[in-house]
């Protein structure tokens, strides 16, 4: 049986994981559960360090673990012919951890186990995502890799939109949402954790069973130490044979951190600079996901027509122009259209970056390369927050932070422009089980 299936049903099954993963990214990390942890559970933890800082440190520790282990984790899954198995196992771990967050009551003592579980879930999620990304070449051809990547990214955004709406209407709006759950002990948000876990599991199931497993490599490393030694040796060889890959990994890490900064600080800026209410921020988040999804979907077809390089460069360039415009306007009336234009180009840049790497990854080493994709991203994940904070401190206004994000996007765009133009088409995926 071939380890590659490119029919529509398999592509849909693969993209279904992206749709389901929004339960963790959008609901747990970005909009709902992390806010509950830091603003409610951790509101009275005491001490001089706020709950948000402790949460940030916990996620930073998770990032260090991911950066150190992800490339080897992806490589070992590839070598053992267990790419799908690895993705499945780590996804189930994330689902279990998400469900366990139901038991985090709205009491200060529960804050500490809450941030630990969130950090461990973040590690497991990234490990699952490494193998999931590596499957891209199994479900696409050289002619369709761009649009398939775009379908996946847009599915993630649309999944987030639907689940956020369900959670907002059912459990958050007013006093406990349409179901009228208690808000005093955080029951409405705790139930959201269960709903999100069930959502993720349900939509991950098609990927578990439809995407085929890959063939194992005869040269499986016997230990993690062997894996690291082989990894560094292969990186040296990769630099000699195709330095473009290393240059791209560095460039994408920088511009993807700028993309992350748009969503990380967008809600803060919406309230402090442009005067949106907290309720309007959630509505803007839903709208932002809609336009990002549409952008990723459309860019996927452009990717296959003109290549990922111009898609990335045009997306980053237009984001920089829009960011500069936002520096000089005030009020919700300007923030809504310009903010949505900014988000429109986030999806295309993300999708095209993934398809670019899928095109140049050496055959049989996709998991390792996407592990490095994650690691390099984590290694520079401080750039956008640092640039934002530095300019805010220098100029004394949150508005200046927009310029910090724009600077990171410009740096990533310049680095990517220096990467050689045409990525090679991927070699045929090896035959499998």
List the predicted regions and their residue ranges.
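Juxtamembrane intracellular "pre-TM" segments in multi-pass secondary transporters
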Residues: 2-12, 212-250
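Short amphipathic helix-loop junctions that connect adjacent transmembrane helices
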Residues: 28-52, 264-281
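A membrane-interface helix-boundary motif in multi-pass transporters
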Residues: 46-49, 171-198, 390-409
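Helix-to-loop junctions at the C-terminal end of transmembrane segments
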Residues: 66-82, 295-308, 392
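Structural signature of the two symmetry-related core transmembrane helices
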Residues: 85-100, 310-325
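Multi-pass alpha-helical transporter architecture, strongest
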Residues: 102, 199-210, 403-433
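Helix-loop junctions at membrane interfaces in 12-TM secondary transporters
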Residues: 102-116, 327-339
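Intracellular juxtamembrane helix-capping segments at the cytosolic ends
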Residues: 127-140, 348-361
